[in-house]
């Protein structure tokens, strides 16, 4: 993460991985997410971890369908790992919201 900060001249946005259907992969994803969170805290200033887990896998459990801002969609591909187009749109919205909160993007009027 530090290498992407370019000496403090930029921001780093890192996304956690939503829990997949497979419990075996789930253990790996939880370890990866814990490492992402630790690294983000250790580096500190200039790093934002955007946590997708609460939206896509509330309670850390796989969900095919999620409700986001009042709309329920099938958020995952049939493989139980990848996001569907609707799921990717939700993830993009979360990233855009964070960028706007950081004033890295203009707010909509």
Q: Where are the model-predicted features located?
A:
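Alpha-helical scaffold elements within enzyme catalytic domains, especially in hydrolases
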Residues: 3-4, 38
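Catalytic His-Asp segment of secreted/periplasmic serine-dependent ester chemistry enzymes
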Residues: 20-109
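Generic structural signal for well-ordered alpha-helices
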Residues: 1-2, 33
